[in-house]
Amino acid sequence: MHKPVVTFGEIMLRLAPPGFERFLQSPQFLATFGGGEANVAVAVAGYGLPSRFLTVLPPNNPISDAFIGELRRFGVDPGLIVRGKGRFGIYFVENGANQRPSKVVYDREGSSIALAKSGDIDFAKAFDGVGWFHITGITPAISEDASTLALDSVRIAREMGLKISIDLNFRKNLWQWGKTAQQVMPALLKHAHVCIANEEDY
């Protein structure tokens, strides 16, 4: 039997006008969830492998509960999720059409994972019996505290013998807390067995 795969990162509420309508045209938004690491967890479960998603969500929050239900629907184990102070991050998407590019507006400041501190997540417990750990460069970009959590996660995963994959997923506009990706990511990458990148990440 395959050992579980754990992915770690932020999940956000995705709000988008239907079809190709623009923000200023539409009286409604379609609500779904979005996050690169959660997408990987769902994909892993789709291949029939045991999959777990780790994040920090606000407590006593119906949106958090709805997301956990969505994970279960796709066969992802949400049992590692930690509840902490803060809010649920949101992003708005306007789908592009023809020559008009898509537009994304983020509203994630003060999200639960951005406010989580080193020690709020017991990574040793989360990684017990796990075979593979996946993270992206989005998590350390969110905040200094999230960057510390990301480094804690890969360091402990490596110490416990897990295979580690890191998708750089460089988002220039996210790195606003004082350090750049070039300053932060090498410390994470030295623990990785697999690095996923493209020409825009360099």
Model-derived segments and their meaning:
Residues 10-12, 97, 109-111, 138-140, ...:
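Short glycine-rich anion-binding loops that position phosphate/pyrophosphate groups of nucleotides
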Residues 50-137:
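Conserved N-terminal subdomain of the carbohydrate kinase-like
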Residues 1-76, 116-118:
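Glycine-rich phosphate/adenosyl-contacting loop at the front of the ribokinase-like
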Residues 20-23, 67-69, 120-121, 147-150, ...:
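Short, glycine/charged-enriched secondary-structure capping and boundary segments
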